[in-house]
Amino acid sequence: MKXLRKNHPLFKIINHSFIDLPTPSNISSWWNFGSLLGMCLMIQILTGLFLAMHYTSDTTTAFSSVAHICRDVNYGWLIRYLHANGASMFFICLFIHVGRGIYYGSYVLSETWNIGIILFLTTMATAFVGYVLPWGQMSFWGATVITNLLSAIPYIGSTLVEWIWGGFSVDKATLTRFXAFHFILPFIITAFVLVHLLFLHETGSNNPSGLNSNSDKIPFHPYYTIKDLLGILFLLTALMILALFFPDILGDPDNYTPANPLNTPAHIKPEWYFLFAYAILRSIPNKLGGVLALLLSILILMAFPLLNTSKQHGLIFRPITQTIYWILIANLLVLTWIGGQPVEYPFTMIGQIASITYFAIILILMPVSNTIENNIIKL
């Protein structure tokens, strides 16, 4: 068996990636979220596959087909709620994974980091098109508002929007193509995940101390396979509690009303995991400016490897940048809260302040604190 594992062309790759992989001996539970994201992706693909067997992507029957899944399909309600809440768990793990990368300076592995950001954007696109599929009120109006943003692009904007819609409004053609995108994108994500892992295993994993750990490595199996299994157990417990006891707590009640183009909901808002970006979008009065700020709110993560001037790796021994980091986290929570509030005073002003603070922390405060800490080390 050992000879097969180490010599077989296919098993050899698996062996070098998950069994005999030399791993730093001191990586903490914050490093569990990569495997949890892999687990989330598998859950989403499997539940999505079973939902796709019963779902119809036609405007007249889409809403009814989701109701049919919940009422008539064996455990359809469970599959649907596991899929909906699985997306929330996916994004919770994703945010923690990115947050850990920033805290411990994992962005110095720039290839892995940049592929990770592309993965983040692809996951956001998948979640957006997926939210449109049940064809409730918030699905329809969310799709209308977000796709309409593309009309802000000079010259080609209006044509581009009509091309994506497949007509002059969000309708049957839009829903059909969104179902197709939602089906294909998870497999594209899976391909990117493999590239992400490929780049990670080229350099080896980062660790909490930020020091080179080549002198102190242990095999991935059994130490970290057991650790990951514990994390997966916690994840599945949380997901089952959400799906069985609070299935609609993270959803929008408006989505239980069938889509009606003649009736606009009072507050159009996306799912909770997009609210921080939505708040940044709304805080800029200009349409094109808002769209650019929305894009930059994610793409700014690519600036971390470029803006890093610190002599130390990670924030574990850097109290000034550490404080700024936690202010950034608090700021993101404020943005998430503002994104779900109506567009009125004082929420608009809080959103504008939080948006400016978000960009200022990453582009100004963190690089400045890096320089200050470098000078303190010299003293």
Swiss-Prot record:
Heme b b562 binds at residues 83, 182. It is found in: Mitochondrion inner membrane. The chain crosses the membrane at residues 33-53, 77-98, 113-133, 178-198, 226-246, 288-308, 320-340, 347-367. PROSITE patterns: CYTB_CTER, CYTB_NTER. The keyword Electron transport applies. Its cofactor is heme b. One of its GO terms (biological process) is mitochondrial electron transport, ubiquinol to cytochrome c. It is a multi-pass membrane protein. One of its GO terms (molecular function) is ubiquinol-cytochrome-c reductase activity. Binds 2 heme b groups non-covalently. Coiled coil: none annotated. The keyword Nucleotide-binding does not apply. Heme 1 (or BL or b562) is low-potential and absorbs at about 562 nm, and heme 2 (or BH or b566) is high-potential and absorbs at about 566 nm. Component of the ubiquinol-cytochrome c reductase complex (complex III or cytochrome b-c1 complex) that is part of the mitochondrial respiratory chain. The b-c1 complex mediates electron transfer from ubiquinol to cytochrome c. Contributes to the generation of a proton gradient across the mitochondrial membrane that is then used for ATP synthesis. This is Cytochrome b. It comes from Akodon molinae (Molina's grass mouse). The gene is MT-CYB.
